[in-house]
């Protein structure tokens, strides 16, 4: 039985609900609207006028799929047994429907979500459709002035205006109107807003790059809430080769007319403007920010504090509090009561002592209640005085009784360090390889248009600096990486594979494999566990990485394209050929990094830094490899197998005794070592002489490694490794047949006998046999000559003319081949 979709509106549904419902009818040809009992005044008027556009039913069918718009509260009195599925399009976070399909996302109007899907699916709409859909977005965003309005709402509306939405009719029903170009410009401005605090004042910056300048755009600026609520703001619009700057101020301290006069413009304290040529919006923004800092800056606590802060609640037990601090690598934390008010500070050092005696007691019994706090607008020198003169390790930053941040000595040192780095211009330019140059610049352009920042990151930066060819490129985006990837894919007409739960997307353009990821921070709930992930800055994204040489980035943003970003000395370590972890608990957070460190050291012929080596040994001795996810360890060994310098990696495995922790029953011995080095010579010879017959030689090294294990253990390990069938067959042959074959080969006097014994064998077995010194020449002879012996076609035809066929012919051919081989 086919169950139709039925849209049911909530009691008193508004214009956004009605517009979204109509959009659902466009999305689903089998959808109907249950005749609404009561609508808001505007929605009722529109429904009456557009009644012919809606497919309406008055009674619910025996079975149906329920569609909810602008809500995900289940209407009362519904026959739930008839509902087969629930679909939701809502922008409110609260609701009682738990299992559903569809979208609940933070936008200004539910209709926006439906319009996005209509656009994505390429569903055709006419001007009347577009008008009906536009009603909801205009109303629920309050003419784009409500706090919840997003760039997505503006872009959805721009799409509807392109489809012919009737502005006159919209104005009559809802509002004053703007052009599609103005709406698109507003979307870009809202998306790019950046807030900074200078001398305790919030100053906002926004930029937009437009095809054509919109003459009345400045009249819209006060309608943008985030700008309107700033003490001052600067909106910078780049269009048709010119850059327009508008400044507005509501603060006695910030005279925008005077500021813009330094750039050739003018005005008064409350408003100013300037028009410039041949200079980008981003460049002007940075120049204005630099000017403001020189003129006004007196560094405040809010400029350097960590926010949002990690806090503990006073009822948490000593044991749980210690776990929380340990997982996050935090030494001290503010403690709050159930009302969210600050009551004290607790340290990890104190908890380590208390956990032995009072593990289950609440921390409110032990917090330090004698401490200093600061407001966000306090000068930094006050923080420095508290930290140095009074010995307090952490300062809670409190505003209106709420902890809004924390400051440590490290924050002050870091602020000074960053200022010095800027003064010294330590960042250097890197030449982006030609094969990725075009895409990199395009990503930078798209990022600029979307108000994002994008960077090439990680191992690809390392390989670029080492002069290696790169075809797999990882980008990190400060902002929505998936949307950037989708736009790049759209421009190239390729598919994109988004993974919203991870904030990543993959796509392929020509030979290039591209991965985009939203900048994120990670915390590990326990050693080796998969991390908890949340959005962050580029710096926080880089600091979560494994080693300094993998924690560099190259900007692809137009204003600083090609700039190397190296917060942790990765370039220096690359030059010094050193593997160095970024922080002391790196191997504890993720023990798989032990194997990664050794893989990179072996591959690049680098050494571990002294501190990294010490930390690695400690992690191995603590048995952390046994706690790591088995699948990730196995995968890391498989990656090592593919390395050209796998033997060097194995030597490092041996040096730091890691395989003993991973493979049950494994032990190194001198015989295994000798075979490994003998195998290298054999492999090098085979790869050179028979390049067309190359196999994955890494598996041969692995077979030698596990040769001393009992068969079942070795077999199980190969199964874990998902070893190819030829590897497993070779291992079985090694354990049960190789010994007897060696003896037969040693006894073989004729070349033909050698040929007969070796012909059925896989190349892997032949190479393993060459490890026996007295068999090496026989195997070489077979590979180079014996297996190539064939009778000329003429000779075979002659035998056939003699009346030989079938088995007799085969036996005669073998006799002749035997004669030839034995003469070699």
Curated annotation (Swiss-Prot):
Q: Which prosthetic group or cofactor does it need? A: Mg(2+)
Anything noted about its domains?
Adopts a seahorse-like shape and consists of four domains: head, neck, body, and tail.
**Sorted alphabetically, which CDD domains does this protein's record hold?**
CBS_pair_SF, NT_ClassII-CCAase
Q: Which family does it belong to?
A: Belongs to the tRNA nucleotidyltransferase/poly(A) polymerase family.
Catalyzed chemical reaction(s): a tRNA with a 3' CC end + ATP = a tRNA with a 3' CCA end + diphosphate
What's the stated role of this polypeptide?
A: tRNA nucleotidyltransferase involved in the synthesis of the tRNA CCA terminus. Adds the terminal adenosine residue to tRNA. Can incorporate CMP into tRNA ending with C74C75 (tRNACC), with very weak efficiency.
Positions contributing to Mg(2+) binding: 472, 474
Q: Which Pfam families match?
A: CBS (PF00571), DHHA1 (PF02272), PolyA_pol (PF01743)
Pinpoint the CBS domain residues: 305-363, 367-423
Q: Where does ATP bind?
A: 459-462, 545-546, 550, 590-599, 603, 632
- List S-S links within the chain: none
Record-given protein name: A-adding tRNA nucleotidyltransferase
Enzyme class (EC, first level): transferase
Return one Gene Ontology term, BP aspect: tRNA processing
For this protein, the record's SMART domains field holds: CBS (SM00116)
**Entry GO MF terms:** ATP binding; ATP:3'-cytidine-cytidine-tRNA adenylyltransferase activity; metal ion binding; tRNA binding
């Amino acid at each position: 039985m086919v169950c139709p979709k039925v849209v049911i509106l909530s009691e008193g549904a508004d214009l956004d609900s009605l517009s979204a419902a109509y959009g659902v009818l466009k999305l689903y040809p089998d959808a109907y609207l249950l005749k609404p009992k009561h609508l808001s005044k505007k929605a009722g008027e529109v429904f009456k006028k557009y009644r012919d556009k809606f497919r309406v039913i008055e009674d619910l069918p025996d079975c149906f799929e329920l569609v909810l718009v602008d809500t995900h509260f289940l209407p009362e009195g519904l026959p739930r047994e008839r509902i087969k599925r629930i679909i939701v399009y809502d922008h409110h976070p609260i609701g009682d429907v738990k299992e559903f399909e569809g979208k609940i996302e933070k936008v200004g109007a539910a209709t926006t979500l439906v319009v996005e899907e209509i656009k994505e699916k390429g569903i055709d709409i006419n001007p009347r459709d577009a008008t009906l859909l536009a009603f909801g977005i205009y109303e629920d965003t309050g003419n784009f002035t409500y706090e919840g309005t997003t760039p997505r709402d503006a872009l959805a509306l721009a799409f509807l205006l392109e489809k012919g939405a009737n502005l006159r009719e919209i104005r009559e029903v809802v509002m004053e109107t703007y052009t599609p170009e103005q709406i698109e410009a507003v979307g870009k401005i809202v998306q790019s807003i950046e807030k900074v605090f200078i001398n305790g004042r919030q100053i906002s910056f926004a930029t937009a790059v437009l095809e054509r300048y919109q003459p009345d755009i400045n009249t819209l600026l006060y309608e943008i809430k985030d700008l309107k609520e700033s003490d001052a703001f600067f909106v910078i619009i780049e269009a048709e080769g010119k850059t327009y700057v508008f400044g507005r101020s509501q603060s006695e301290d910030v005279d925008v007319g005077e500021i813009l006069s330094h750039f050739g413009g003018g005005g008064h304290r409350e408003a100013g403007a300037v028009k410039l040529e041949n200079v980008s919006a981003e460049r002007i923004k940075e120049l204005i920010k630099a000017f403001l800092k020189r003129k006004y800056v007196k560094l405040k606590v809010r400029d350097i504090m960590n926010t949002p802060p990690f806090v503990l609640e006073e009822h948490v037990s000593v044991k749980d509090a210690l776990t929380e601090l340990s997982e996050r690598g935090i030494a001290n934390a503010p403690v709050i009561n159930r009302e969210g008010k600050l009551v004290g500070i607790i340290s990890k050092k104190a908890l380590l002592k208390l956990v032995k005696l009072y593990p289950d007691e609440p921390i409110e019994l032990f917090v330090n209640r004698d401490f200093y706090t600061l407001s966000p607008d306090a000068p930094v020198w006050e923080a420095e005085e508290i930290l140095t003169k009074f010995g307090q390790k952490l300062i809670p930053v409190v505003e209106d009784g709420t902890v809004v941040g924390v400051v440590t000595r490290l924050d002050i040192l870091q602020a000074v360090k960053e200022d010095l780095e800027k003064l010294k211009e330590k960042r250097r330019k890197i030449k982006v390889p030609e094969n990725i140059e075009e895409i990199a610049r395009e990503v930078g352009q798209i990022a600029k248009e979307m108000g994002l920042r994008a960077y090439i990151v990680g191992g690809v930066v390392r390989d670029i600096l080492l002069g290696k060819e790169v075809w797999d490129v990882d980008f990190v985006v400060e902002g929505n990486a998936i949307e950037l990837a989708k736009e790049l894919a759209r421009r190239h007409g390729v598919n994109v594979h988004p993974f919203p739960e991870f904030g990543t997307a993959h796509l392929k353009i020509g030979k290039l494999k591209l991965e985009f990821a939203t900048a994120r921070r990670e915390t590990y709930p326990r050693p080796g566990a998969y991390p908890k992930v949340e959005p962050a800055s580029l710096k926080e994204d880089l600091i979560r990485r494994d080693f300094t040489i993998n924690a560099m980035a190259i900007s692809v943003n137009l204003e600083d394209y090609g700039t190397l970003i190296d917060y942790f000395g990765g370039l220096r370590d690359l030059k010094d050929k050193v593997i160095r972890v970024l922080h002391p608990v790196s191997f504890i957070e993720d023990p798989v990094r032990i194997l990664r460190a050794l893989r990179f050291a072996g591959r690049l012929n680098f050494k571990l830094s002294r501190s990294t080596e010490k930390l690695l040994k400690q992690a191995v001795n603590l048995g952390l490899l046994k706690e790591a996810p088995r699948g990730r360890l196995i995968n890391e060994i498989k990656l090592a197998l593919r390395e050209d310098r796998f033997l060097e990696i194995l030597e490092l495995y041996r040096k730091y005794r890691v395989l003993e922790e991973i493979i049950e029953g494994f032990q190194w011995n001198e015989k295994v070592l000798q075979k490994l080095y003998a195998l290298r010579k054999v492999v090098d010879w085979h790869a050179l002489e028979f390049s067309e017959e190359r196999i994955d030689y890494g598996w041969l090294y692995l077979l030698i490694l596990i040769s001393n294990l009992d068969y079942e253990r070795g077999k199980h390990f190969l199964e874990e490794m998902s070893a190819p069938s030829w590897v497993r067959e070779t291992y079985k042959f090694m354990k049960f047949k190789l010994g007897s074959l060696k003896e037969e080969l040693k006894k073989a006097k004729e070349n033909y006998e050698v040929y007969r014994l070796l012909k059925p064998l896989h190349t892997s077995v032949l190479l393993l046999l060459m490890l026996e010194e007295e068999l090496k020449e026989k195997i070489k002879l077979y590979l180079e000559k014996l297996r190539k012996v064939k009778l000329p076609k003429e000779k075979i035809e002659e035998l056939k003319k003699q009346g030989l066929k079938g088995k007799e012919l085969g036996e005669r051919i073998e006799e002749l081949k035997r004669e030839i081989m034995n003469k070699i």
